[in-house]
Every structure is written in C-alpha cells, then in structure tokens.
C-alpha cells in the first residue's frame, strides 16, 4: 500500500511523533493506522525509558478548580525551561490536573503504594473468592483485581478521561517522545469541599 503525505500528516497529528518516524511506522504496518500508532508507542516507550534516568528539574505548577468544589495543585517537571514554556506541555499539565480532580488517585505510581496496603488488598480479594479453587486460579483472580485497584488508585495507571483507551502514563510517554525530554509528575494535592484530611 502506498503511504501518502496525508496519512503521514494524520499520524503526526495523532501521535506527535516526527515525520520520518510516522512514515517508517506506516511502512512497517503496511498502512495500518492503529498498528502504526502501536509501533510509535513502543518506540516512544523505549525513548521514555532512556530519558527516565535524566533529571527533570524544570517544569510548572498548575492548578485546576472544578465548580468551586474540587481543587487540584500539580507539579509537572521536565528538563528545560524551553519545554516548560511550551503550550503543549502546559496543556498536558492541565489535562493531568483535570484527571486528578475527576478520578481522585491516591498515588502517582504503583511503586508508591506501601507493601502492607497491597497485602491487605490481596487478603480482602482472597476472602471474596467463593468455592474450592486451585491456588493458581486464586492467584490469577487476585492479580486481576489488583490491576483494577492500581488503575483506580494510581494516577499513571488510570485511563485518561478524554481518551479512555490511553493511560496517563501513555500520554506522558507520547510527550517524552515528542519533546525528547524526561517528563514526570513530581507531586499533587487534591482538595474537596467538606472532605476531611483522612478521607
């Protein structure tokens, strides 16, 4: 299948990847748009992993208020002031702040969850399993429930509210590939009217 300039343009707009990368991905996928996106995502992930070791000391603090009832403050870091001033980076920060307001994550990533919290969840899931099931089946069920728990509790594992087929970590990975810089959520805080500190 011939790869047209229009196809390359559309893929660039959708992924934010470079023109040559988009062309190569379309050629590799035989013109299949979704496969090309997957190829770019995989490459982006490789790029993100290489860049993750670099320190992100620049960035912005952004806030989002929803109906005067929910407020979020977020620090999103990058490596250079140039990227921090970029409109697309600022939009990413806004989108993540909106995500936090809507989905109320408790942690940034699963590695931040204390081990005792995970163990407690596993015990609860095991106690909910009815019948005499083999240990490996129980383990599979518990793992599945734990994945759901991570999706609920961890910002990076949550489906993006604007594009639910994409996770927040995918969204960040795409921008890492586009800007060629490490990007990370440093911290966030979420307030809700009437909510106590322990809730």
From Swiss-Prot:
PANTHER family from the UniProt entry: ELONGATION FACTOR TS (PTHR11741), ELONGATION FACTOR TS, MITOCHONDRIAL (PTHR11741:SF0)
Source species: Thermodesulfovibrio yellowstonii (strain ATCC 51303 / DSM 11347 / YP87)
GO annotation, biological process: translational elongation
Function: Associates with the EF-Tu.GDP complex and induces the exchange of GDP to GTP. It remains bound to the aminoacyl-tRNA.EF-Tu.GTP complex up to the GTP hydrolysis stage on the ribosome.
Compartment(s) of residence: Cytoplasm
One Gene Ontology CC term in the entry: cytoplasm
Protein name (database record): Elongation factor Ts
Alphabetized SUPFAM superfamilies for the sequence: Elongation factor Ts (EF-Ts), dimerisation domain, UBA-like
GO molecular function terms attached to this record: translation elongation factor activity
Keywords in alphabetical order: Cytoplasm, Elongation factor, Protein biosynthesis
Family the UniProt entry places it in: Belongs to the EF-Ts family.
Pfam families assigned: EF_TS
Region (Involved in Mg(2+) ion dislocation from EF-Tu): 80-83
Gene3D superfamilies the record matches: 1.10.286.20, DNA helicase RuvA subunit, C-terminal domain (1.10.8.10), Elongation factor Ts, dimerisation domain (3.30.479.20)
Keyword hit for Signal: no
Keyword Protein biosynthesis: yes
Membrane-spanning ranges: none
